[in-house]
């Protein structure tokens, strides 16, 4: 499998919006935002970032790869936990600066490193003038200590 190269995005807005060429617009750090949802029920699972190499690997292999800003490297989602994400569909937004992955999650059907299905397991509420977090999905599909040793 050869290296997948993305062409530079067009300056022509209509070309970005209506043409058939996928020319992702990476930010000044070389990243694009990836919104990830379950292919079956549409639940929002996570938001991550990809560089060109992670996006190319995802397209070529059908398995989600992301770029870790904190570790400064690419990771295959679920490689340690067994919760690999098989990509069923990739969409891009109108100006091609974000992508939306629809995935099936293997293993424990959990995406979050906390063991939960989704990274979005809390709501933000206002109590006594202070923003607070409330857990709305506390079901853990695996124990992070067992999987990651943390």
From Swiss-Prot:
Localization terms from the record: Cytoplasm
Residue positions binding Mg(2+): 93, 95, 97
Gene Ontology CC, one term: cytoplasm
Pathway(s) it belongs to: Amino-acid biosynthesis; L-histidine biosynthesis; L-histidine from 5-phospho-alpha-D-ribose 1-diphosphate: step 3/9
Membrane-spanning parts: none
Pfam families assigned: PRA-CH
EC code(s) of this entry: 3.5.4.19
Binding of Zn(2+), residues: 94, 112, 119
Role of this protein: Catalyzes the hydrolysis of the adenine ring of phosphoribosyl-AMP.
Family: Belongs to the PRA-CH family.
Name by which UniProt lists this protein: Phosphoribosyl-AMP cyclohydrolase
Organism, scientific name: Rhizobium etli (strain ATCC 51251 / DSM 11541 / JCM 21823 / NBRC 15573 / CFN 42)
